[in-house]
Amino acid sequence: ALQNADDRREELRGQYREMLRQTKNIAAELTEARRTAAKKLEQEIVRELSELDMDKVRMRIAVHTGTKLSAHGFDTVTFEISVNPGEPEKPLSRVASGGELSRIMLALKNVLTAGEDVGMLIFDEIDTGVSGHAAQQIGRKLSAIARKKQTLCVTHLPQIAAMGDHHLRISKSVRDGRSFTDVSPMDRAHRIDEIARLLSGEEISDAARKNAEDLLDAAGQGA
């Protein structure tokens, strides 16, 4: 029995060594696949960002290969970026502002879901920290995405809201001591009023309404 136990122990050790060898080989293949994919992903993200008013950006996806094996192989991956000419690439969290992060997340989501069978994309305030021309660029990008996939966007920016094919107004109320969230579709008149409210606040001026109409018409959403 003791001899059998020794034989079994040696057999298990051999199986372990073989499995470890195979795992290391697979991890090495995964490293190569990551490095290849990283180069392609860098180019695609930079192209997306150039369409979002970030045409000077440089992106590097760094694959750091260590010696400790984990469920993800030997690698750790960091996304590094330079948003200004002459500056080295640094980790996203140390470089990008709120508005830049919003656009980077939009670019990432658009690239990573391009080949996937995704029925709907939801963007919750993807426009945080942006305004003006950058907001218009984000609106155009969201509109382009929506031509391929159903897209739901929560926004407080009129430039982006005007790009939507359909508009839903979300409001909160308290009834009988309880909070309720109401969602209601809007016709043209309500769309103009709500976009005007985003432009001017609670007191809607005639100028704000005219501006809202112009935004809708420019986006091709006047009906």
Regions found by a protein language model. Give the residues of each.
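Long, charged, glycine-rich C-terminal linkers/tails
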Residues: 50-75
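Conserved D-loop-proximal element of ABC-family nucleotide-binding domains
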Residues: 35, 39, 115-116, 128-136
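Extended, charged alpha-helical coiled-coil/arm scaffolds that mediate oligomerization and mechanical coupling
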Residues: 1-52, 56
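Walker B catalytic acidic pair
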Residues: 124-125
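GG-anchored amphipathic helix commonly corresponding to the ABC/SMC/Rad50 NBD signature/C-loop
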Residues: 78, 83-86, 101-121
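Flexible glycine-/small-residue-rich
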Residues: 61-65, 81-85, 108-110, 172, ...
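C-terminal lobe/lid and adjacent interdomain/linker elements of RecA-like ASCE P-loop ATPase modules
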Residues: 77, 133-223
